[in-house]
Each structure stands twice: as structure tokens, then as C-alpha cells.
A protein has these predicted regions:
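Flexible helix-coil linker/hinge segments at domain or subdomain boundaries
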Residues: 334-344
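Conserved, well-ordered alpha-helix/loop/beta-strand core segments that scaffold catalytic motifs
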Residues: 1-37
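Solvent-exposed, charged/polar functional surfaces in cytosolic regulatory/catalytic domains
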Residues: 24-27, 252, 256, 334
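Short alpha-helical functional segments enriched in proximate histidine and acidic residues
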Residues: 28-31, 142, 338
Length: 350
């Protein structure tokens, strides 16, 4: 039998993007004395993984550096409650299920909502708010009221359609699906918490994939890390019109008064959402936090989906907007320049 030449294996990872992402997250972990940090970047149009980094990391050529906690690819092996980064998808579900439209106003009351024996609180009072304002001010009550107006299956169905609760398809060792709730009976507070990112857990790669689907105007593109041309398994999972509405709302979060204003990149339209979730521990929640920023750029025609996670930052500064967002901005700025994405000078919303 004649010998066959081996085929070359080419990754979609861009070495330049990998380098700026690793440098930024390594610095952030050191600055905030955090336990770990992760970054994943996807090409919105193709689903290609452009960068995937973790800190602490290790040098595979140096065996003395091989410690298990350094060798985990946390982007796929670690699942966590997504906190407020999930809120754009609640608004998307409300639009898709006809319980809200672009002009809907939600009355969030005095900032405290009683549900049975529990309470849902907002960090800042928003009163009667548009969908855009609910996202901009990250109102827990706003998304709770939207979630209560649709069957729980409708919200979970949308979460599932953008990739939550499913393996990414990258076929990398150690990947987990996260924890996706499947109960048959839901209390009001359980329905509320899944709307602001508690009660389910997802991986960083799933979060990036969901944002990429939003940026691709509702077209779900399977993600891949090995270059290959023989794939077109994309499918439209939400309407283009509703995805565009949510994208434009997401942009307001990086503008003045928004929780992700430190994720902005000068000259570009950026849409991003921050999240801060308390870590689950035996019997409840601990005093440790995970901070996130997830988003897209440029909003005019999204090219890059990016998720930045800083795990257990120490000190008084533990919000996603102040810990993860500056890292997001630094990486996104470098990536847009490296990929020669033209600035948005004339495309800003009036």
C-alpha cells in the first residue's frame, strides 16, 4: 500500500489576537489578584475561534510548569452562572414571543419586587423604562417582568437555540455543557432568577457563541477551531429584525450612563453587557464573585464577539463594569485594528 502524506492541520486561532488577549488577561488577573481569567473571541460571520486564552497558563515545553490548575482550558471546562450578561436574550425572547415590541415600557416600581416570600431588587432605580433602558441600567425587575409574561419554556427555548446547555461542537477534551434547568414546576422566584442569570450555568464559549449569534442577526453558525471549507450548517434561530433591535439596545450600554461604558472603543460602535455573579458554594452563595463583559463590534456590521471573565477578583472592586470591561476594551481595540476593521466614524446612531 502506497504511503499517504499526512494532511496539514490549520487552526482558526489568529496568533496576533491570541497574543494580545493573553497579555491583557494575564495583567488583569495580576492587577486584581484574581484566581483566574479567560478570554474567548469568535468571528461572528463564520463561527471561527480567533482567540482562546486562560490565565494562569503553562508552557507545554516545560514539564516543571505542569500543574493541573494551570492546564485547564477554562473557556470550555468551567461553567458559571452568567449573571446580567444573559439579559439581552430575555429581551430577545420577549420580542420573539410577542410579549414586547420596540416601544414597550415596563414599570419597575420602586426598585423592589415581591415574589411570594422573595424579593427581586434593582441596583439603581429606573422607574418606567423602555427595553433599551432596562438593558442599559441592567434592571433585574425589568427582565423579571418580561420573563413572567411568557411561558418559561419560551425563554428556555430561546436560551437553548443560541447554544446554552449544549456542547460547542469543538470536540475539545474536558468540555462541559453547564447546568440547564429542566424542572417541570417553577416557582415565581425561579422564573425570575433565570432571567437575570442565576439558576443556570454556562461556559464562556457558550456565552461567546450566543453573542456571535446575536451579532450575526440571529443566524446560528456552528463554531469551529480547525480550518475547513466544507460546512454550511447555519440556521436562522431568531428574526433579523429582533436581533438588530437588541444589538442597537446593547450599544447604549457602552454609552454614557450605561454599565459597560468602560468597554467602549473610541471610533467604533461597540455593544456590550457586563455581569457580576456571586459564586455558588455548598448550601448557598459565597463572598467570591465572577465578573464578565460580553459583547460585539462594530455594531453597524458585527465582526467580532468577545467574552472576558475575571474570576474572584480581590478588593472592593468586583463589578464586571470595572474589572472585566477595561480588559474587553483593550482586546477589542487591538483586534479591530489587527483585522483592519474600518472605524465607524459616520455610522453612529443619531
Amino acid at each position: 500500500q502506497d504511503k499517504q502524506e499526512g494532511k496539514s492541520l490549520q487552526l482558526t486561532i489568529d496568533q496576533r489576537l491570541q497574543a494580545i488577549a493573553y497579555r491583557a488577561i494575564k495583567q488583569a488577573v495580576a492587577d486584581h489578584r484574581a484566581t483566574s481569567g479567560s478570554v474567548v473571541m469568535l468571528d461572528v460571520k463564520t463561527g471561527a475561534v480567533l482567540a482562546m486564552v486562560n490565565a494562569p497558563s503553562y508552557n507545554p515545553n516545560n514539564r516543571t510548569d505542569w500543574q493541573s490548575y494551570k492546564m485547564r482550558n477554562r473557556v470550555i471546562t468551567d461553567s458559571m452562572e452568567p449573571g446580567s450578561t444573559i439579559k439581552p436574550f430575555v429581551i430577545l425572547a420577549a420580542l420573539e414571543n410577542g410579549v414586547a415590541d420596540k416601544d414597550t415600557i415596563v414599570d419597575t416600581g420602586n426598585g423592589v419586587l415581591r415574589l411570594g416570600g422573595s424579593r427581586v431588587r434593582d441596583v439603581s432605580w429606573v422607574g418606567k423604562a423602555s427595553l433599551s433602558m432596562i438593558l442599559k441600567k441592567s434592571s433585574n425587575i425589568g427582565v423579571t417582568k418580561l420573563a413572567m409574561q411568557m411561558p418559561v419554556e419560551a425563554l428556555l427555548g430561546l436560551y437553548s437555540s443560541v447554544g446554552f446547555g449544549e456542547l460547542s461542537g469543538l470536540n475539545l477534551v474536558g468540555e462541559v455543557t453547564g447546568i440547564f434547568p429542566t424542572r417541570t414546576r417553577w416557582s415565581p422566584i425561579e422564573r425570575a432568577t433565570i432571567a437575570f442569570g442565576y439558576g443556570l450555568s454556562i461556559t464562556p464559549i457558550q456565552l461567546a457563541h450566543a453573542y456571535a449569534t446575536l451579532g450575526n442577526l440571529g443566524k446560528y453558525e456552528p463554531i469551529h477551531i480547525i480550518e475547513s471549507n466544507d460546512r454550511d450548517m447555519s440556521r436562522q434561530v431568531v428574526s433579523k429584525e429582533n436581533a438588530r433591535l437588541v444589538l442597537d439596545m446593547l450599544e447604549t450600554v457602552t454609552q454614557k450612563g450605561g454599565s459597560a461604558r468602560r468597554a467602549a472603543v473610541p471610533g467604533y460602535r461597540v455593544g456590550a453587557k457586563t455581569g457580576t455573579s456571586r459564586k455558588a458554594s455548598a448550601g448557598g452563595y459565597s463572598d467570591e464573585y465572577i465578573t464578565y463583559t460580553a459583547g460585539l463590534a462594530p455594531v453597524s456590521d458585527p465582526r467580532i464577539a468577545l467574552v472576558v471573565i475575571v474570576n474572584e477578583p480581590q478588593g472592593d472592586d468586583y463589578y464586571g463594569g470595572s474589572v472585566a470591561s477595561p480588559v474587553f476594551s483593550e482586546i477589542m481595540k487591538g483586534a479591530l485594528q489587527i483585522l483592519n476593521v474600518a472605524p465607524d466614524e459616520n455610522k453612529f446612531q443619531q
